[in-house]
């Protein structure tokens, strides 16, 4: 994966007991992320690639890298669909 997710800068968010709560100011909708999605959210800085995030997830939760890659891909797609984050192309160099 050579894509880098980045959080939507228009959203307000806070970490509560290790989980992320996101509030959309446009419609006041609240999104509560589970522990895994919260970790993806924290690493979605537009710099780390999906592969890098998957590696961190695999280490954090002691799961196979391929399983982590699949989880990250699904989470990123879901969060992008909800306009909570955007995906940019990673700069290879």
Task: Locate each region found by the language model.
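Long, low-complexity, charged/polar intrinsically disordered regions in eukaryotic proteins
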Residues: 1-25
């Amino acid at each position: 994966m050579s894509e880098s997710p980045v959080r939507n800068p228009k959203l307000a968010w806070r970490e509560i007991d290790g989980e992320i709560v996101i509030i959309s100011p446009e419609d006041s909708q609240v999104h509560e992320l589970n522990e895994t999605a919260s970790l993806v959210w924290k690493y979605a800085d537009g710099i780390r690639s999906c592969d890098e995030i998957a590696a961190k997830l695999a280490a954090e939760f002691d799961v196979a890298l391929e399983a982590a890659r699949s989880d990250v891909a699904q989470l990123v797609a879901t969060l992008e669909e909800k306009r909570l984050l955007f995906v940019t192309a990673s700069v290879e160099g």
